[in-house]
Amino acid sequence: MAWFSLHLLHLLWAAAGTSTWARSSCSVPQAAQHLVDGLQVLLEDSVSSAAPPNPSVLIAMNLAGALSAEARELLADRLGASDSAGLSVGQLALTIMALNSSCRDPGNKVSVLYGQMEAWPPSSPSAPAWTFYGPSLAVLALCQEHPGRALPVAARLAKILAAGLSPFNTDTGAMVTLALTCMYNKIPEGSEEGYRTLFSQVLKDVVENISMRIKDNGIIGDVYSTGLAMQALSVTPEPPNKEWDCKKTMDTILKEIEQGKFHNPMSIAQILPSLKGKTYLDVPYVSCSPGHQVQPTLPSQPSPVPTSASNITVAYTINNQLKGVELVFNETIDVSVKDGSVLLVVLEEAQRRNPMFKFVTTMTSWGLVVSSINNIAESVHDRTYWQFLSGKTPLNEGVADYTPRDHEHITANFTQY
């Protein structure tokens, strides 16, 4: 796909620093603006000195126009002082972009990231799609810093993707699109034409794959991948074969917000830029001039009448049938918890009643992730992890966010990716 092939559009985009989608036909209606304001307040309230600094949160705050200067400065200070050692390429790339969006110098973090990507082993074309998410973020961050230096790294990533055989992943596809669109628009003058052809072909294939994930209600992939996918589709000057109705997507997302689907800070960070008509390509153009930010007036909500919550029963199964793992088991327990409890409460009650259900969690940018059950731990080397399902459907929320229903059957299945 020829991204920003019209030279005039390319110049306008570079000068304005904004994406070119028709915001007038895909913007948040004034009547629903309070929903977006509420999300942003919730996001910024999640920032504290006790919580791990999340660069995605800072990027979203800056793209949206931070309401709390105190929260923004706290997050920027902590990320600026963070040690690059031990960070994945994706985490380091996000940190660089977060600092740039705050008009902070990322210092030697850029050189560290470039060194990591130079040493990045070319993955097999059949590697899981998510393994390309971090490198795509790295290409995007390096493109915004020094596109000429990023060119060979981006070309290596694009060549691997061009031969890709692994199942498509919407989040990764969206990040690939943003990264290679940045590179396509910033190919240094005098570079070989082959770079443009390579990026164009990969972009065409990836965007077509994203468009095939557009559901009838406008959701792209699932509700939590839609934010990044909106960014990706909004920066393409050449629409995919399946037309994207941006307004339908926006309307459905607003309904999901109204129903309380977005309360995890990371999920808010990924949807907020699109609600504000921004993308990660706008990071270098964020204005850092001082200005008085007015806290939005949120509609007052009537105080809920205290009620005595009834109990629900959840069937909870832990299952490991992987060959080569010493302990094989399939155990089910019925757990009674208060209605409205999150899944984590179910796991804690199961663990209290039966030590076989003992579990360990790890904190990630998306919140708590279960990393071990019954002394069987996930392993990057063996590509194993604990997948949670409702019936046969994988959950798209974490254990601290998902609220099970009465008589729902939740399974934790030890599996490979």
Swiss-Prot record:
Signal peptide location: 1-22
Subunit structure, interactors included: Interacts with CUBN (via CUB domains).
Positions of disulphide bridges: 26-246, 103-288, 143-182
Gene behind this protein: CBLIF
Binding, cob(II)alamin: 171, 222, 270, 365-370, 386-395
GO cellular component term, pick one: microvillus
Family statement: Belongs to the eukaryotic cobalamin transport proteins family.
Main subcellular localisation: secreted
Name of the protein in question: Cobalamin binding intrinsic factor
Modified residues (Phosphoserine): 191
GO process terms (BP): cobalamin transport; cobalt ion transport
Keyword Transferase: no
Domain of life: Eukaryota
Coiled-coil ranges per UniProt: none
